[in-house]
Amino acid sequence: MSRIGKQPVPVPTGVDVMIEGQKVSVKGPKGALDLTVAEPITVSRNDDGAIVISRPNDERRNRSLHGLSRTLVSNLVTGVTEGYTTKMEIHGVGYRVQLKGANLEFALGYSHPVVIEAPEGITFAVQAPTKFTVSGIDKQKVGQISANIRRLRRPDPYKGKGVRYEGEQIRRKVGKTGK
């Protein structure tokens, strides 16, 4: 049996979970999220009030969906209680970020400023001209927006300039040697 899938998802106080067939709806202090679980997987509540994910048989596809579904439901519960945050930083001379309303405006060495609009459920915060955070309750959305921002100017392997996650180690290359 899936080691991750067989563990029940604890539901903290203040979180309301609705299960209707394959659809799981979670409401908490930070907001509400929905998830439709893949077909062979079933979702139910146990006596403790925890969410239990089960599969009908041990087919390969069902085994893989079992752990995935449990993790996705767990991410919903964590999202509506704590939320998710990605810390990012910018390295490079003249590279900076500023908050314009709810949107981020980047100066990344292009001939124009790059504006990233905040989608619904995502908030940006700027701590310094080179440090900012992406926050929200949906883990997938926070990660996707962070990846899109990083893609604006990927870290350069020679000088390390660009947008990166906080604490990310960039593999550096040695430049050409002169004669």
Swiss-Prot record:
InterPro entries, A to Z: Ribosomal_uL6-like (IPR000702), Ribosomal_uL6-like_a/b-dom_sf (IPR036789), Ribosomal_uL6_a/b-dom (IPR020040), Ribosomal_uL6_bac-type (IPR019906), Ribosomal_uL6_CS (IPR002358)
Signal peptide stretch: none
Cellular component terms (Gene Ontology): cytosolic large ribosomal subunit
GO molecular function: rRNA binding; structural constituent of ribosome
UniProt entry tagged with the keyword DNA-binding: no
Keyword entries, A-Z: Ribonucleoprotein, Ribosomal protein, RNA-binding, rRNA-binding
Pfam families from the UniProt entry: Ribosomal_L6 (PF00347)
Cross-referenced NCBIfam families: L6_bact
UniProt function note: This protein binds to the 23S rRNA, and is important in its secondary structure. It is located near the subunit interface in the base of the L7/L12 stalk, and near the tRNA binding site of the peptidyltransferase center.
Family membership: Belongs to the universal ribosomal protein uL6 family.
Name used for this protein in its record: Large ribosomal subunit protein uL6
